[in-house]
UniProtKB/Swiss-Prot annotation:
Name of the protein: Regulator of fusion ref-1
Chain positions covered by the region annotation Basic motif 2: 162-175
Lineage: Eukaryota, Metazoa, Ecdysozoa, Nematoda, Chromadorea
Family matches, as SMART domains: HLH
Region of interest: Disordered: 1-24, 133-177, 313-367
GO molecular function: protein dimerization activity; RNA polymerase II cis-regulatory region sequence-specific DNA binding
Domain bHLH, first and last residues per copy: 11-63, 162-219
Main function: Probable transcription factor. Binds 5'-TGCCACGTGTCCA-3' in vitro, probably via the E-box motif 5'-CA[TC][AG]TG-3'. Acts in embryonic development in a Notch-dependent manner, perhaps as a direct target of transcriptional regulator lag-1 in the Notch signaling pathway. Also acts in embryonic development in a Notch-independent manner. Plays a role in both Notch-dependent and -independent pathways in the execution of neuronal lineage decisions in the embryo. Also involved in regulating cell fate leading to formation of neuronal structures known as postdeirids.
Originating gene: ref-1
Species per Swiss-Prot/TrEMBL record: Caenorhabditis elegans
Compositional bias ranges of the Basic residues kind: 356-367
Length: 367
């Protein structure tokens, strides 16, 4: 009986395939995380992996130009942080106008070129090693790639190439573009001394993405200072950066005849986004009900109705129940005459009028 020391070929192939699939899934997850970090920097809603990697090269190059080195100057860092926030709000406002998608894309692209041109003029130092591709070159390359991939591939003789061959060429082109982007990210890591060249040569793509993601996160939140003076400088620089970017945004809107009518709306959008507060005419919190009070005069829901007067206090009357006189004879059976008399005192009879006494006297035939 011979023991097999090596696994069968089918099992080894399946294991290698599962490991390759796991590695691709991890790379795709890292690219998705990278896209979330640079989403505010982008002007496209849907981005391919090649677009994300190329945009990452642009973002890290610009970040290093704006705030070189691991530590940042509070004035420089605060200015470009405020500048970037207004730039992102401008793109969001353009997308919220509700225009056609092609028109919106054109507005955003022109606005980005306008901001990039003004930013480059504001930068005091420009890194010659990490020159990023301009937006026009990226747009031209992406459009040419899409036109080549979307157009039917034909040979010189006019015979249509097999669809499998076209699909294979597209996949190879996609891999080449991703490879170029990864090479650019590795060169950035070496130039900025994030790692040595020997380490980068043996580095896999997953490690490259981890380093770039950590770099972007550190650059976005790298200003931590306990000094009150530096915090004050940073806050003042943010305000100046926002002010400068607002002026640039208004200049861009005034340069277009379709956007010039939206300048007032843009100003309100900036005001509400930077310092949100309830605007006039919008529903606000209800006024709290005051505690109940007891006024002298009660509340009258219908003032034209007379209010009932409170009963006045009077002295109690002497309770004198009418009764039959003991000296009077029993009542008569005749129903026409009443035998009940109103009791009266002698003083009252003496003071009363004699005519009234005659009228009040009842006729009794038995008297």
């Amino acid at each position: 009986m011979v023991l097999i020391s090596t696994p069968p070929p089918a099992y080894a192939h399946n294991r290698k395939t599962s490991q390759e699939k796991k590695r691709r899934d991890e790379i795709n997850a890292k690219i998705k995380e990278l896209q979330l970090l640079i989403q505010n920097e982008s002007d496209n809603e849907k981005m391919t992996q090649g677009d994300v990697l190329n945009r990452a090269v642009e973002v890290v190059s610009r970040m290093e130009t704006e705030s070189p080195g691991p530590s940042s100057n509070p004035n420089r860092k605060g200015f470009f942080d405020g500048f970037r926030s207004i730039e992102s709000l401008t793109y969001s406002f353009i997308k919220s106008l509700g225009v056609n998608s092609d028109v919106c894309q054109d507005f955003v692209q022109r606005a980005k070129q306008f901001f990039d041109r003004e930013r480059s003029s504001l930068l005091s130092t420009v890194s010659g090693k990490s020159k990023r591709r301009s937006e026009s070159e990226i747009l031209h390359s992406s459009m040419s790639y899409r036109s080549q991939s979307s157009s039917p591939s034909t040979s010189e003789s006019g015979i249509t190439i097999d669809r499998k061959e076209v699909k294979k060429n597209r996949e190879q082109d996609r891999r080449d573009r991703q490879g170029e982007a990864f090479d650019a990210l590795k060169n950035f890591i070496i130039e900025n001394k994030l790692m040595t060249s020997h380490q980068v040569e043996k580095m896999q793509r997953l490690n490259t993405l981890d380093i770039i993601i950590a770099y972007i996160q550190n650059k976005k939140h790298n200003f931590v200072s306990r000094s009150d003076q530096e915090q004050s400088l940073y806050a003042h620089a943010i305000a100046e950066g926002k002010k400068t970017a607002k002026n640039i945004a208004f200049q861009f809107f005034k340069s277009d005849r379709h956007l010039v009518v939206r300048c007032a709306d843009l100003e309100k959008f900036f005001e509400f986004s930077l310092s949100p507060k309830p605007l006039f005419g919008f529903p606000s919190m209800p006024i709290p009900i005051p505690p109940p009070s007891f006024p002298i005069f009660p509340f009258r829901p219908f003032p034209f109705f007379p209010m009932p007067m409170a009963p006045m206090a009077t002295s109690p009357k002497s309770q004198q129940s009418p009764s039959y006189s003991l000296d009077s004879p029993p009542p008569s059976s005749d129903t026409s005459s009443s035998s009940i008399e109103t009791p009266s005192t002698p003083n009252e009879n003496s003071n009363s009028n004699p005519k009234a006494s005659r009228k009040s006297k009842l006729f009794r035939p038995w008297e």
